[in-house]
């Protein structure tokens, strides 16, 4: 909830009181990310770079999550870009995906905020702690959560925004030559047929173990997000409104 705060300013010059003015401002929740604002009635200033503020690799909960990921034995340690083995980075990323799936996240489309107006635009974003405690994420929550974990293991993440959607990417090498993308809403309990209607994937899930299903959704998440990136690549790198390619390492 927004709370009003009054600010009083008193001016004096050469010992003479020049008067006082009082302005009332609204203090908003840290969960409200400012997307942009309109100045002078016409010019829009994009502030979506503020999404980066929700990427928090220093969160105390991360150590516990990384320990859970190591306990899966998918990887023995997190080396970031140090390993030269083929697929080493993707394997580390999958270990993170796997443990988040075990926490049974659910997709939640809640993104409304009391701040948005025809002058100031914002979106509600769950903090790292909020997302873990509620086990609910939307596309933005999932992207900044996953980016936080990637940063914690020294893999450089990317936040990608298209109109009405966000997904996360990561560089697969230290030189930033190659990259992959993930559709984080697929971490939750989803119907794969919604993403791949022509493949009837849900029927192939019958009888598979939890880890087999987790790996399948991880690979399909990459496939889906990489396709979306290619379809929107021109806009993503154009600097146009509602598009964003934000490298968190920079």
Describe these PLM feature segments.
Residues 1-250:
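A structural boundary/capping signal
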